Amino acid sequence: MTTAQKVQPRLKERYRSEIRDALRKQFGYGNVMQIPTVTKVVVNMGVGEAARDAKLINGAVNDLALITGQKPEVRRARKSIAQFKLREGMPVGVRVTLRGDRMWEFLDRLTSIALPRIRDFRGLSPKQFDGVGSYTFGLAEQAVFHEVDVDKIDRVRGMDINVVTSAATDDEGRALLRALGFPFKEN
């Protein structure tokens, strides 16, 4: 009987072999635990129309499950807001938190396949860091991921992607994400 070998994600392997050493030299860390790494990736899809039609949330759940390979959590309204015809407990979005190997695989697919498929894409804004090295950006449609069949999309949905790093500053986070292959605009 053969034993199956666990395959490391390509981006994780590259981080451990090249990127970690380059960041250590660039910032002069004394301890290996100071070197920034990606902690988690949170993918959020807001579905405000689900307040009027509860079936719309199923399409968002299916799309996000295909894109991330993990079952999304349905997010519900915490407060009732009359102007939006929203009641407490109604579904308003779906969210997935990716960690470990799934996170590395998702980042690899995002940077090498999905972002280059965006029409008129000129790079990500380098100014969307939160002050402690984490980066948040949005995608206008889910069709840029090759897992989603364009013919089976019931409606175009955007999503927010939050890449949480262990970096202490925005410069460290920017250097890490640039080394991982995130295409930032040059000012």
UniProtKB/Swiss-Prot annotation:
One Pfam short name: Ribosomal_L5_C
Keywords: Ribonucleoprotein, Ribosomal protein, RNA-binding, rRNA-binding, tRNA-binding
Coiled-coil region list: none
Highest taxon of the lineage: Bacteria
A single GO cellular-component term on record: ribosome
Keyword tRNA-binding tagged: yes
MF terms in GO: rRNA binding; structural constituent of ribosome; tRNA binding
Any single biological process term in GO: translation
Keyword RNA-binding in annotation: yes
Assembly, per entry: Part of the 50S ribosomal subunit; part of the 5S rRNA/L5/L18/L25 subcomplex. Contacts the 5S rRNA and the P site tRNA. Forms a bridge to the 30S subunit in the 70S ribosome.
UniProt function note: This is one of the proteins that bind and probably mediate the attachment of the 5S RNA into the large ribosomal subunit, where it forms part of the central protuberance. In the 70S ribosome it contacts protein S13 of the 30S subunit (bridge B1b), connecting the 2 subunits; this bridge is implicated in subunit movement. Contacts the P site tRNA; the 5S rRNA and some of its associated proteins might help stabilize positioning of ribosome-bound tRNAs.
UniProt similarity note: Belongs to the universal ribosomal protein uL5 family.
Name of this protein: Large ribosomal subunit protein uL5
